[in-house]
Amino acid sequence: MTKGLKKFIFSPFLFSLAIGGHPISIDGSFGDWVEVPIIYSDNNDDAIEADFSTLKITYDSEFLFIYFRFHEGEFLMQDWNDFHLYIDVDNDHLTGHQANGVGAELVWNFGNRSGYFMINDQQIPIMQNDIKLRVAPTITSREFEIAIGLDSPGLTLDGDQQFSNGKIVLSEVNGGGDYIPDDEGGLNFLVSDDDQTLFEPISIERYDENNIRVLSYNTLNNGIIDID
């Protein structure tokens, strides 16, 4: 069995390399992506607004990880955008949503924070938790990393298959928007069951029992201090 993730489309801007999976922490720091090879590098100045630069893909036993970067500017992935992710999970361009030469069973609209998966020509709406989606950073940035659960209905066709390979397209749908890849047909990738370095969870234990810990987080409402 072929192991790792491999790029199959050949172009001066594509790089082909078989690799094993990498455990990635979706924290917006990107240091754990250094060892993951670029599978697509896009031309500069081929878009009006959001101009994609590079794309990386890897995985562990639970998640598919995707990293992408823009040539210039900063963007907010949670709102105010028309970025779409398309994944063809059955490698059949005749099924699913038609997008730049692929038939995507999983479609995600980052700006709307929603999407759908297609099965038997029906669109099944999904939200972030349905595909275990993680996106970082949650502020404006030039680069982003995301994770999607390998057992999510969008990748398993609602449990009918174990996801092992597919094709991906990333786009800004607005007029003049950019695509990864530029050519139709998407980017092929594999998810294998090769041996992987286990992710080491970050401990939340106190270094010193005498320390006092203060936790802060963003909320939609002031539930912590507003008793109503």
Regions found by a protein language model. Give the residues of each.
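Acidic/polar low-complexity flexible segments
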Residues: 21-29, 82, 86-113, 139-141, ...
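Glycine-aromatic-enriched beta-strand/loop faces of beta-sandwich-type recognition domains
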Residues: 107-139
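A short beta-turn/strand-edge loop motif at beta-sheet boundaries
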Residues: 46, 73-79, 154-160
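Short, solvent-exposed loop/turn elements at domain surfaces
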Residues: 32-38, 75-77, 94-95, 213, ...
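N-terminal, active-site-proximal structural segment of metallo-dependent hydrolase catalytic domains
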Residues: 192-228
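Low-complexity, serine/threonine/proline/glycine-rich extracellular segments that form mucin-like
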Residues: 60-65, 69-89
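Short, well-ordered beta-strand segments enriched in hydrophobic/aromatic residues
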Residues: 28, 62-72, 144-150
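Sec-dependent N-terminal signal peptides
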Residues: 4-20
